[in-house]
């Protein structure tokens, strides 16, 4: 049977990844399960919060271009890209940056809006690397993030001394700022992220060449592995890499 030129063009224009309805519902189910203190259930195409708030997920809508989702993400968009836990198999594919696509409305409701004040009332001080180079850092108590980071720190202190130079000093946790290329709040604005030693790290914007992003990383996976065990994802697994960066995103990674 002859294939028309229009059929070929439509096929080429289709999204590379198409989420089936059942698959999309399963991913949204993982989102609800990841935040039991805040999310009650999935009701059709709506996430119901424990306070009764109903939030549309965007389920059933066609997948949009990466740059559009990055700046205007639905909850379904937030769950589209799978985070590859475990040792890296190689550089991330083009635009595969699981965790960068996120709904600002979702996280502002969960952690508070630092631009309006009061979010810091949910923070407490965590001492970063107390046996190596103590440094007080504010971290959110929502979703037990502060407690989980303390577990990370305890394990990092057990690593060989040769790895400590990648960790200290930390480049910070809470910072009420936006992401440079999107204008949306960073996970640092929720005090749910930490940057390790910037002097030993790499960032995609520093290395961009003629529209391409050559992958660079100096952070040993032994460090990222400790964070992943507590459900922090690593920016070193993003196409738009940020190798100093870790953020608490339990909907994207399993763990205790």
Stretches with model-predicted labels:
Residues 1-7:
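Bacterial N-terminal signal peptides that target proteins for export
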Residues 233-256:
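A cross-kingdom marker for long, charged
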